[in-house]
Amino acid sequence: MDRKEIAEQFYMEEHAVLYALLVKAARELYGDKGELANVEGTIQYGRERGRRMALRALKDGEDLSPKNYLLYSEWVDDRKWSKKDVYAISPAFTTHCTHCGWCESWKKHGLLEYGNLYCSHIDVNLVKGFNPDNVLNIRSVLSQNGPCCDFEF
């Protein structure tokens, strides 16, 4: 099975549920140490993905700007499970995600309390991995009862 076939069968819901179940098991088995391991793993995963994105941008002769961070994203929601819009361009580029397939998957399976750890760490570390000089301010996230995922670059 090639990467595309795997991606078609293992989509957002499967990723979300797998992540949340790992967090749940680590908390139940190891308490705070399990929680810390999940945080550290999510940070490392985000930074590694960000670095891969940066390498592709640099290979193409592009700079590591916030714009190119968005253009070189590794993950595309082909099925449109999430809804993200540009909220503002100035003074800062801001996006609002008003419906999140990850969050909805965690809710569907009763795993929101475990999955929301992902939201606390992944995006900031994707940005840091892409370019440590870029800053992402996360003002709210759906999985933590925010009105939307409010990201300001």
Language model region names:
Residues 1-93, 101-118, 129, 134-148:
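N-terminal accessory segment detector
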